[in-house]
Amino acid sequence: MVVFFGSIFSARIEMPGRTAKEKALLDAVESAIEVVRPEAQRQIKTRMFYPYISDSSFMAVCDDTLAIQALETNMPQYGVKYTHPVDKIRQIDVPVVNIGTFGRDGHMLTERVDMRQTFQNVPNITYEAVKRLLS
């Protein structure tokens, strides 16, 4: 039996708040949540680790060089059929957050989302966070 990683690599995103940029973004999001929370009707949760596939995986790399090398070693097609632009992503290196909705059956015919979260809370949290970052 041969075991290897066969899918493309989508880097995990972790925001521990170690840098000034990370702290500023986290503070802006937390402040935005406090503004929106009274009208949210549901609990708004924050997580410092986002384990799902996201386009934000192309904005920062949280893994060190040894972890990336271990991944490449365990992907037989790495460098042949697939490469991940780690060096270019490290040049971008911006803190990211995923302010998103929730629902059921994502990307399926039966997909549905919580309308208040999707069309009210998410835009308002995003707006408030950006406003704080730019002020």
Could you tell me what each predicted segment is?
Residues M1-S135:
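An extended, acidic, His-containing surface patch that forms the Zn2+-binding/catalytic region
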